[in-house]
A protein has these predicted regions:
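Acidic/glycine-enriched edge-of-secondary-structure segments
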Residues: 1-11
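C-terminal domain-boundary segment and adjacent tail
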Residues: 13-110
Length: 113
């Protein structure tokens, strides 16, 4: 999901954290402008959100360009004709969801699926 900083941020954060067990990789995209934080208790809302979601070992915290670069790497993945392996020609690991399992397609490697 995508969420503006003043659009039920705490709700979306809790929903994101409530995922359990093995799961499909997800993206929670939070957006807004820094000048908006001076209104409606914005700094407190964002700081509370960051405290709640921060420090999680299984969450990747990324900037816009990092997300873009990651998506570009995923788009370059090369799958075998029978889809039993994938080659990752990029310098960045990519993560796939295959048959209910999360699979790491290591940078520069062929990964069995």
């Amino acid at each position: 999901p995508t969420c503006h900083i003043f659009n039920d941020l705490a709700y979306h954060g809790e929903k994101f954290l409530s995922r359990t067990g093995r799961r499909k990789p997800m993206l929670l995209y939070v957006w807004g402008h820094s000048y908006e934080l001076d209104e409606n208790n914005g700094w407190t809302l964002l700081e509370d959100f960051c405290r709640r979601l921060g420090g999680q070992a299984d969450i990747w915290y990324a900037t816009n360009i990092e997300i873009y670069d990651y998506r570009q790497s995923c788009a370059r993945l090369e799958f075998s004709a029978d889809a039993d392996r994938v080659y990752n020609p990029s310098c960045r690991d990519c993560w796939l969801y295959v048959d209910g399992q999360t699979v790491r397609a290591a940078a520069g490697q062929i990964t069995p699926l």
